[in-house]
Amino acid sequence: QPENAARELAGSVNVRIALFLLVHMPLAYAMEAFWPLATAHAVLVLLAGIRWAWLGRTRQVLYCLSYIAGFEVLWRMTEARVFWEYGKYALALVVLMALFAEWRRSDARLRTVLPVILLAAMVPAVALAVLQFSPAEAFDQLSFNLSAYLALGAAALYCWERPVDRPTAANLLLALMAPIVGILFLASFSTITQIGVDTFATASSWIRSGDFGANQVSNVLSLGALAGVILLIILPRAQGARLLIGALTVAMVIQGILTFSRGGLYSLILAGLAFGLNLLTTPGARGRFLLLIAVFVALVFGVIYPWLNDLSTGAVTARFEDLDTTGRLELARADLMAFQDSPVLGAGVGGSMPYHIYVFGEDVGTHTEYTRLLAEHGLFGILIMALMGWMLLRRYLGNAPGLGRAISAAMAIWTLSVMAHSATRIVVIPFALVLAFLAWRLDEEREPASLAGDNGLPAPTTAVAPTRVR
């Protein structure tokens, strides 16, 4: 009897989800304390992804891509000894291996040529960068500005119209959310342990971002919260897991506010609205979403906001009432000057920097991806933006009304809004865009019986690589 009870407990969906999410708190702490663990983790996750790609395990490849995207900032925070853009190249490498293995085993062909055209449109600006800079400087500029597009193009080729059912969707979002739970833990731990040092100045906070860049942490927390909201709608019957996910989602919103980096919260609100509006035609999901919104609004405005504002002696209100763009408008104006000077081919990748120095007084990279595309790619930048818009529209309309379109719209709006204030600094930005390209097959009338079985939510030791490194 005890053995059967233990086996039943171990097989519980609630327990498996809770263990998978919560194990990333001590894992993040250990990685921060011991950088070789962070490095080994980054390498082993990539190796696991390559292995799954080579074996043609499509679902595991998708989970690994999601996990890499969620973990990139945590690897940076814990000082894993991998290069800065490792997450983007790791994601691209796994995808390219998966495509090669898929084509090797069958007569499969490209589902769409649009990502190829998008990447080809960047060639003129790449050529200009190679001609203008030394080889080392050209590589740095190309890697910093375009590695996200390499990841986007490769992942779009793999994920375009690829069907995702409800259990796979749940796993995919859990794989994305789990490492962000680790980021949440480090940021919260830093906030609590340094509360006497923190002055709550009305500027983005390094301390309340886990001693890391507030912009990146805020954006990742907002995507983790968005994943949590979607999971609360699509997870059936797992009440205990949904309570935990709800608590983690609220915690991510709170910590996102405390970073004082406003962009992530704004993007979350916009994406949440897009998600909710697309559920209005789906009775079951609509009811759950409206209940979720009612509870969330009551918590935020009745409890969380007054508490945070009192804790910060009014700094929260002052920060979010401040309309200063912290130099983004000046950088965007510099980009537009570069576009006016070179409207056809653009200034080349990295070619907008002299304009930034002229207008802003510092050698600062742009935070608005759309103006960077104009400045450095010229008319080809307009083509790139048009292609991204067309791809998103096609896949949005290709998904069925209801949950499918809701997820596609939420991911698209989150990405497009983040690109307006944070460019493509982190790999979750192109990855979230790629999630909008999937064919979400979330049948409202069918409860997935496999969710608690072998084809459902995987145990932490088999879903993704992280729990193999402890």
Language model segments and positions:
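Membrane-interface helix-loop-helix junctions at transmembrane boundaries of multi-pass membrane enzymes
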Residues: 52-61, 102-114, 231-247, 282-290, ...
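N-terminal signal-anchor transmembrane segment
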Residues: 4-104, 123-131, 414-418, 429
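Aromatic-anchored transmembrane helix interface
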Residues: 83-97, 112-128, 135-161, 174-185, ...
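Hydrophobic transmembrane alpha-helices and their immediate junctions
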Residues: 376-418, 448
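Long extracytoplasmic/lumenal interhelical loops at the membrane interface
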Residues: 307-377, 396-399, 403
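Alpha-helical transmembrane segments of multi-pass inner-membrane proteins
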Residues: 126, 150-158, 168-202, 211-281, ...
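A membrane-periplasm/extracellular boundary helix in multi-pass inner-membrane enzymes
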Residues: 186-194, 254, 258-259, 276-320, ...
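Transmembrane alpha-helices of multi-pass inner-membrane enzymes
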Residues: 227, 406-417, 423-470
